[in-house]
Each structure stands twice: as C-alpha cells, then as structure tokens.
Amino acid sequence: MPLSYQHFRKLLLLDDEAGPLEEELPRLADEGLNRRVAEDLNLQLPNVSIPWTHKVGNFTGLYSSTLPVFNPNWQTPSFPDIHLHQDIINKCEQFVGPLTVNEKRRLKLSMPARFYPNSTKYLPLEKGIKPYYPDNVVNHYFQTRHYLHTLWQAGILYKRETTRSASFCGSPYSWEQELQHGAESFHQQSAGIFSRAPVGSSIQSKHQQSRLGLQPQKGLLARGNEGRSWSVRSRVHPTTWRSFGVEPSSSGHTNNFASKSASCLHQSAVRKAAYPTFSTTKRHSSSGHAVELHNISSSSAGSQSKGPVFSCWWLQFRNIEPCSEYCLSHLVSLLDDWGPCTEHGEHHIRIPRTPARVTGGVFLVDKNPHNTAESRLVVDFSQFSRGSTRVPWPKFAVPNLQSLTNLLSSNLSWLSLDVSAAFYHLPLHPAAMPHLLVGSSGLSRYVARLSSNSRILDHQHGTMQNLHDSCSRNLFDSLMLLYKTFGRKLHLYSHPIIMGFRKIPMGVGLSPFLLAQFTSAICSVVRRAFPHCLAFSYMDDVVLGAKSVQHLESLYTAVTNFLLSLGIHLNPNKTKRWGYSLHFMGYVIGSWGTLPQEHIVQKIKNCFRKLPVNRPIDWKVCQRIVGLLGFAAPFTQCGYPALMPLYACIQAKQAFTFSPTYKAFLSQQYSTLYPVARQRSGLCQVFADATPTGWGLVMGHQRMRGTFVAPLPIHTAELLAACFARSRSGAKLIGTDNSVVLSRKYTSFPWLLGCAANWILRGTSFVYVPSALNPADDPSRGRLGLYRPLIRLLFQPTTGRTSLYAVSPSVPSHLPVRVHFASPLHVAWRPP
C-alpha cells in the first residue's frame, strides 16, 4: 500500500507524537528505508513511456516558444541626459574625505568600462532587427529603429559614420576627445584614410571656410577604385560625400569633413550608392546654421554600375509612375521635404576598424509585466556567452539570504531609490564599439528579405532590380499608419544604420558585474558620509534606512543631492517609502526577520493548484518549478532537502512524476512560511561531536554520550549529534568541528534525514571548534570521566562577502559635519 501523507509526516518526525529523537533520527539515515520511501513516492522510477507534460500553469520549458505579444501603440521610454561625471572619485573625496582602496578600485572599473572579447562573430545587417513579430514586421522595424534613434540622441549609442569614425550626442569624455579629429590633427592622422597625403590638403583647399562651416566650392568625388586606393576627380557635379552609414555631417566645423571624405564609397556593403538628382536640400546643422547639400547626379555614379544607381530607395518613389493604388509613391509624394537621409552627432571620434555588420540582434518587448504601455529594447549579444567565442564573465558576491537578514533586519525606517536607466550610466571605452554593434539594413532590404515575391538588391552591381517589387498592400497600410506617428522620420528610419554602444548594454554578462561594483562603492561612500544611515544596494536597487522617519527624509534629500551631483539620475516619482518593513530583492525584511514578498507566495499557491499528479513532467518545466520553490525553500520546515528528488531528475534530464503524497508534502511545506531570523552574537555554551559509532554532547557543565546501532558515515554521525544537542538543550548556538554541518547545507545527506535535520536545526547558528579543543570530543569516544574546561567561543554573525563596512580613513578635520538637524541619535549608528 502506498505511503500516505500522514504516515510520511510521522516518518519525517514533523508530528509531535514521535518517539525519543535519539532512537528515531538515526533510522532516517538508513539506506534501505530511503530507497523504499523513494519507490513508494515514485521518486526514482526508470524512464516512462507516457508522453511528457511540457506545460504546467504558466511554466513551460526553458527554451519555450511562447511568443511575446506585440503592441502597436508602444511608447518609447524617454532617457534623461545621463552623464556620469568623469572625476567621480575626486567628487566623492571632496564630499567624504579620502576613499578606501576598495572603493577607488570599484569606481575605476567603470570609468570607462572595457570589453575585449577574444573573438567576435559579425552578422549581416539583415539580422540587426529580429523578425520576432511576423504579423507586425514593418511596425516592429520602425518602433525598434525609433528606439535606437532615441538611445543615440540620449548619448547611449555611437553611430558608425565610416569604418574608422563614429559620431555621438551628449557630453564627451576625455578618452573620447583624445580621438577627435581637430582641424590640424586630421591631416597627420589621415594616413589611414588616404593613400597619398596631398589629397587631404587638396580637399581642404577646395573648400572655403565660411561661418556656415565647410561648404563645397567646386565639388570633388573621391571614388573607391579597388579596396582602399583613392583618386580625386575634379570635373564632377557639385557633390557631397554620401555613402552608406556616412552622410554629410550636420555640425558646422572643419572636422566634419574628415567624416565625409573618409566615408567615401569604399566599404563593401556600400558600393551600391551614389545620389540621385534632386533639388538642393537645406538643412540645419547642430550648431544652428543651415548647411547646403548638393546631390551627386546619377551620371557620376559608381565605377562598375550598369545604368543609373540610386542610394536613397525612399526618395526614388517621388518621380516615378505609381504601379497601383498601394504604390509607395503615393506616400512619398505626400511631403516635399522628407528631411535628411541621415543625421550626425555633435561629436566625431576615431574608433578601431568597425565593419558594416552587427554582432547582435535587437527586438522590443513590454517594459515589464506591470507596464505594457512602454517598450524595452532586448539586445541579444548571446554570442559572448556561448560556444567557442564565450567570454568568462567576472564572478561577484551576491548577498545571501542570511547575510541580508543579518544586515537589514532591524527597527529602521526604509525607503528605496529608483535609479533611472542604471546600466546606461556607465560609459564604455570606444575600443569596445566594434564588438557591440546593433543596427538595421534599411527598410528596403528588410522588407525584401521577408516578402517572398520581391528580389533583394543585386549585390554584384548594386542595381535595384525593380522598385515596385516592394510595393504591397500590407506595407502601404502599415506605412500610412506609421506616417501618423513618425511623420518625415519614416525617411530617416528607412535608411540602413549601424550603431555601437557608448554605455554598457544590458545583454552582456559584464554589465551586471560592473553595475554591482559601481553601486556598492557609491553606497559605501554614502555610509561614511552619513554615519547614522544604512545605505545598501544590489544592482540598481538602492535602499536607505534611518532610525526615524524625519531623519530618513532629511537623509533622502541629502543623499539625492549627492547622487545628482555625481551625475546619477534618480526617478523621484518611483521612490518608495516602506516604513519598518523593507521590500528588497523579492523579500520583505522587518525587525522580525525575512519572508518572501506576497506576489511570490501567490505564485507558489497557483503553481501547486496546477501541478498534475501521476503525469511525467518535462525536466525543463521542473527547472522552472524548482526555481520558484527554491526561492522560498529557506522559509519552509524542510528547506532545500525537500526539493532534492526534483533536483536529481533535472540533473539526470529525466521526466519527474509527482505522486499524490509528495505533492501533498510539498504543498503543506509551502502553505506555512516561517521567517528567517537575524543571527545574534553570543557565547557558545553547547558543543557536539561524534565518531562513526557514538555521539557526545557538552551543555554547560552537563555531559552526555550515546552510541549508534550500526556504524554511520562520519558526516551523518556529526549531523545527528548536532540535532541531539539542539533538541536536548534548545540552544541556538552550537559548537561543532564538522565543516559540512557548519555549512548548514543538508542536501547531500540521506534524503529523509536531510529533511528532518533541516527542521530540527532551523534557526541554529554554528561555531567552528577545532577537534583538539572540542569539549565534546571525549564524551563522543565514550570517556565521560575526563573533564576539559569549556573554551570561550564568541559567535559573530556575518554579513557575507557584501563588503559593507569599509574601514574609514581619518577624515580631514576641516570638513563640516554633514547632517545638521535635531537628531534623536547622538551616537553614530553601528550595524546590528
């Protein structure tokens, strides 16, 4: 008869009417019993022929194909003008006195951040925007392109102008200015651009300098003959240097000319381009002047083309006969002025050689489950986490649950700060640009690739087979709708573009590491500037605690001003005041301890409601289930050991079948959650020790010993001794000389014993006693007569490796006291 849930509870000693612990507990270590229970509960059956279940409630396998939902009305979030101050270390030192070595090292890591992978795979531009939403291809293309444009305008992306130059908006950093083409320096650096020096000077002389910036007087067209050899022909129509990804610069300074001339048509992806004959367009430079642009007439186009070649796919629809009522020429003729073909940033810099390719695809999703009105850009740089091009990301300490509780469980008032676009605060060195490229191939190529009837551009000669191939009702309808949203920007966005990251992107394993180092260093500085405040952060989640609400408010003002002075942008609308129970990292932390947040508890209840019984569940779905249950495991009676059967089946990549008893057991475990309490420091009075055959305890001056029925593995024996010590003495502090017991991880013990021991030892702290000094050593060997004095062992709770309290160097005396207010606190508050 299968094991019922009541019997199972009794077996695990979870009920009160169990017999004496010294007899019952060793029985749970018996291998035979564990095997019989496992068979009864269906925990280790061989592979089953019933088909696996691949979905449980909302959980599907890790590589599930649940497509995200496209929202045609997504708003692109706005990004503040984020510019982290370059001399952040000096600013902190003015504020708080000398920084510690640790803080300096962490801050220097991200000023600027560097990223040098061993090898980088380049993908064609068509893969720049992922076709994630097959029914909304065009809409998704423009929304994504608009998002990238917004990031570029906010100074978060570089725009690739030529193979070796890029432009960006916002304030430059010193490592970027060093690369800038000045009027003079350009000629010395131009060796990489022109093969013969005189070309540079001849170009310069042919251009008059006016207050409008650089204007072509008699045009020149530098044309790629083969590879990078250059020739200059002067009997050509008035021109500007236009080619793919490089179009005349809009800032009225000499150095822009570098980007124009350097651009010329020598990139392979670009060879298809020169410009059609239309009117001269006026357009405004970033410095506010109008710059005249003249276009190349089609007769002067590229060297090997057969017939006229146009680069601007969009504007060609202006002068041709419509092919049908859905021809794009109807849309293009709506406006006379579609604006420039490309825009240029305020600053131009030299960059390492960057091909006209991308290294990762992008697509849009909802900003978060609670905010579906705004979009979020997902960047897939997974090539750096997979296969031969894998980069070993740096490891960093994440505070574990006990450390977090020791640190934050107190009677303080709390608030949490919201750092807006935290990742985009940290600057990347321009040398990383060639590895982190995103972009798009332009609308014509994108549409051609996705529609079966149209042919992609003829690469060999760069001719467009037939403009009307791309006209279709779907495209026309989508573009007419988008015209209402984007207006003349449709033209700008229909051009190809390549962008590199100027701030750290979210899709690279380096970013979380850098952000964690950065915010922890800043919090360390804040804690020393305001000694009676507790500031703590994990990634972009920053919390402040103080003894009273008034105190907290004045701290909030002071800390916010300090962070703003460093160039860190906070979102004041999202500041949350928690009172005495802090919500942080998915937990609720109060003076009583820590519990999981309510939404997680609800998720667990729903999970159990939908768990099928006696049906094999795909191990990938089990991973999802274990992920959720594992988060709340420390708050249950049996903890992680209860989930061991699930872990085992995931490791074996086998399906798992929940028996009614095992499901009832887990469901009961998670129905009552117990808080994890803060550890207290204290003097250890109770010691436990064991040998394979016997155990011994010392409680103050009382000593006990006992023997096991059969010899046991030493770790198991030590664990049993610790359980006896806890149940006999009730002490929350026990001395032991076994490292496995000290670690409080009971997952490697026989399953039933692990579950029972977890419940008995819940909330117990252990202190390490070397065997030679352990008073319980003699009793465990059966020698009660010998008496050795108790050693004074002090237990200090740890805050793990969260490196909280930087040793503060002496602050120079002339610095004023930071916080002036009637504080109820006359002494600096120390951590609990």
Curated annotation (Swiss-Prot):
Top-rank taxon, per record: Viruses
Transmembrane intervals: none
Span list, region Spacer: 178-335
UniProt xrefs under Pfam families: DNA_pol_viral_C, DNA_pol_viral_N, RVT_1
Gene3D superfamilies reported in the protein's UniProt record: 3.30.70.270
Ranges for region Polymerase/reverse transcriptase domain (RT): 336-679
Catalytic function, reaction form: DNA(n) + a 2'-deoxyribonucleoside 5'-triphosphate = DNA(n+1) + diphosphate; Endonucleolytic cleavage to 5'-phosphomonoester
BP GO terms, sorted: DNA replication; symbiont-mediated suppression of host innate immune response
Keywords: DNA replication, DNA-binding, DNA-directed DNA polymerase, Endonuclease, Host-virus interaction, Hydrolase, Inhibition of host innate immune response by virus, Inhibition of host RLR pathway by virus, Magnesium, Metal-binding, Multifunctional enzyme, Nuclease, Nucleotidyltransferase, RNA-directed DNA polymerase, Transferase, Viral immunoevasion
Regulation: Activated by host HSP70 and HSP40 in vitro to be able to bind the epsilon loop of the pgRNA. Because deletion of the RNase H region renders the protein partly chaperone-independent, the chaperones may be needed indirectly to relieve occlusion of the RNA-binding site by this domain. Inhibited by several reverse-transcriptase inhibitors: Lamivudine, Adefovir and Entecavir.
Annotated EC: 2.7.7.7, 2.7.7.49, 3.1.26.4
Keyword Repeat found: no
Residues reported in the UniProt entry to bind Mg(2+): D418, D540, D541
Start and end residues of each stretch annotated as Terminal protein domain (TP): 1-177
GO MF, one annotated term: RNA-directed DNA polymerase activity
Residue ranges constituting the Reverse transcriptase domain according to the UniProt record: 346-589
InterPro entries documented for this protein: DNA/RNA_pol_sf, DNApol_viral_C, DNApol_viral_N, HBV_DPOL, Rev_trsase/Diguanyl_cyclase, RT_dom, Viral_Replic_Matur_Polypro
Residues annotated as site: Priming of reverse-transcription by covalently linking the first nucleotide of the (-)DNA: Y63
PANTHER family found in the cross-reference section: PEPTIDASE A2 DOMAIN-CONTAINING PROTEIN-RELATED (PTHR33064:SF29), POL PROTEIN (PTHR33064)
Domains (record comment): Terminal protein domain (TP) is hepadnavirus-specific. Spacer domain is highly variable and separates the TP and RT domains. Polymerase/reverse-transcriptase domain (RT) and ribonuclease H domain (RH) are similar to retrovirus reverse transcriptase/RNase H.
Family recorded in the similarity comment: Belongs to the hepadnaviridae P protein family.
Other information: Hepadnaviral virions contain probably just one P protein molecule per particle.
Job description of the protein: Multifunctional enzyme that converts the viral RNA genome into dsDNA in viral cytoplasmic capsids. This enzyme displays a DNA polymerase activity that can copy either DNA or RNA templates, and a ribonuclease H (RNase H) activity that cleaves the RNA strand of RNA-DNA heteroduplexes in a partially processive 3'- to 5'-endonucleasic mode. Neo-synthesized pregenomic RNA (pgRNA) are encapsidated together with the P protein, and reverse-transcribed inside the nucleocapsid.
Descriptive protein name: Protein P
The organism of origin for this protein: Chimpanzee hepatitis B virus (isolate United Kingdom/LSH/1988)
Designated gene of the protein: P
